[in-house]
Amino acid sequence: STCESMNLLGNKVQARNLAMKIGVPVVPGSDGAVDIEGARKVIRKIGLPVMLKAEGGGGGRGIFVIRTMQELEDAFVKASTMAEASFGNPRLFVERYLEHVRHIEIQVIADQYGNVFAFDERDCTVQRNHQKLVEITPSPWPGMTQKLRDQLKEYARALVKAVNYYSLATVEFLVTQDGTPYMIEVNTRLQVEHGITESRYGI
C-alpha cells in the first residue's frame, strides 16, 4: 500500500537500502544506523569528512558535519539527542560529506496503474545550513546535460515503482562536478518547492 511505501521511502536508511538494491547510486556510508564505534569503523573505511544524519530527519535538520575524529563523540551525542527531540528517533547513520556538489531534485507523479511521470529537475544548490533558499528549473548548471537529466528521471521513477508508490514524490540527488549523481532521500509529499514546477508545467 502507499502507506507502507511512504513509511519505507520516508526512512532515509530504508530508502538508501532500496536504492542500493535496485542499482540507484547512493553516497558511500554506513549500511544502517550505527553507534559511536560503528561510526568510527565507517570513517576508517570511507575517510573524512563525513555527515552524521538522523535516520528520521528532514528539512536539512539533524545533520552534523565531522571533519576530525576528535569531533565525533561530542557531535554524536548532540546529533542523537537532537534527532530524538525533533523526530522521535535517535538513530544516526553516516555518509561521506561531498563538497562542491549540486543539489538536484526530481519530482514524480505516479498513479495506481504503474505509470510514473518525472518532471524536469529543480536545482536547489543555493542553501544555508542545509536548508534551501533558491530553487531553479531547469537547472542553470552547464553540467546538467540531457543525458544526466534522463538518468536522474529514470532513477527517480525506478525508486517509486519499486515500492508501488502512487501519488507525488520528490527524489533528491547530490551531483558532483563531473556529473556523478547520488540519491540522498525521497520526500513522499508535495514539497514547498513544487511552486516552480507548477509555474513551469501548469500542474
Predicted segments, located by residue:
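N-terminal beta-alpha lobe that positions the nucleotide/phosphoryl donor
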Residues: 1-171, 175-200
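Catalytic cores of secreted or luminal carbohydrate-active enzymes
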Residues: 203
